[in-house]
């Protein structure tokens, strides 16, 4: 058989190398936000977004929005546009002058989401807050089925799991005592919580999160000394009981102190304390300080707020005895925008020489100055993020996974819709670098396969679980990350009922993923379970049932394909088509050679016959 002319090795291998190059490099990171408000809300994009939660247990997060001072509207996620529809409404018009907060949770342990509202009562003469719980029934709320709590609060309460039964409890100072009280979920009984000489700061930024590295949530309090100096207290959970662990002061430079936030800022697997504030009362000079876990030292991670000759700063909180709109303190909202494993933040900044007020992304980047060398990371204001800088008079900005794809998008509230209501803006994150993530939600574990109506309670908003992972990054180094679930609930904390942990551009399996939950009084053993070889770009739903037998806990894994899956498929199909083309060409050339050889044989036969 004669051989035809074969393509060169370079020609054969070129597309294969091209496909591999595409896979290894991936698309270049792009940073842009696309406004999808009309697609999500239609004409209903107004009201104060107050909380997130899955009310109807369909594995999609719903939005809790306050309107007209006293109405709560629940926008249920839907499969068709507009993707969030106002389906459930409860009103406090007969009780309230102004609803101030919304905290979804399962307050009676029936695995159905209930909703706690705090409000200023009508004709209120002081700043005491009333509270009411609307009880969930059949994956919705019954406006007539509610319980008005028999005590009022000095400030918005912290929702936590005080007794470790995974039914949310209500912590705060009430009209009955100057000492913190706890309303236990389930039987709704009042009990003393702690004995302390400190006064609670108003507005507080208490938190229920593990700060002592034992996978059990501790109690963090923002308090005042007898001389009204700001301080912070950590009450450690020891055997299910809270004992004072440490007390520390604010950074000495700060005059205006904002709300504490918690994040694994430097990616070491431990919680760090972030504190925004100002070094003068008018916030002409703003800063963000960080205290690393266990150090007791404040380190500045952002002090540069100038952009092209314009100085920006935080918006100081103005305390009103009888506010007409929801008070919004100086707050950072935390989320990993670019999935690099280092949490970023959203903040509202004001032009110090004008009146413009905007939302800005604070990106977590490697430290480039001497002041933050200890933590190796710092915040950098992203001044020109397309889409975000078009929204004027912003008052709140937070992260939210709009499309349930593991990428955190942005929601901004801005003034000017009406006198009493604000506009909602939703911005899709078009960050195209093919980074990886794992999305974790820990349920209450009050039931497993025996849940009422066979519906797993995906939407109970469980405070207190702690999550940590270890993996190997793209350079072969060990990488850790951690997060607490629903650690803060007051003053528009707007925390998500799940955690999205960025993994960077490493496609390696998570070597270990740990989940810990609170434990009851008297229980010495830590409630913690480990899972290994978790696939990146997956959602892990953890059901800690039964609570006291971690080895029996179950986890459901749902995969979310990334861009690289499509890229791999395209490259593979391209290589296959090219190989088929080569085979076809070789087959055609071989057929031509065979025909030529047959003609030559026939010609030789005729010649011999002559």
Curated annotation (Swiss-Prot):
Glycan attachment sites: 35, 123, 138, 145, 150, 175, 241, 351, 369, 480
FG-GAP repeat extents: 98-135, 153-183, 256-291
Short name of one Pfam family: FG-GAP_3
Localisation: Secreted; Membrane
Signal peptide limits: 1-32
Superkingdom of source: Eukaryota
Residue spans crossing the bilayer: 565-585
Keywords tagged on the record: Glycoprotein, Membrane, Repeat, Secreted, Signal, Transmembrane, Transmembrane helix
Membrane topology qualifier: Single-pass type I membrane protein
SUBUNIT field: Interacts with RUVBL1, RUVBL2 and alpha-tubulin.
Official protein name in the record: T-cell immunomodulatory protein
Organism listed in the record: Mus musculus (Mouse)
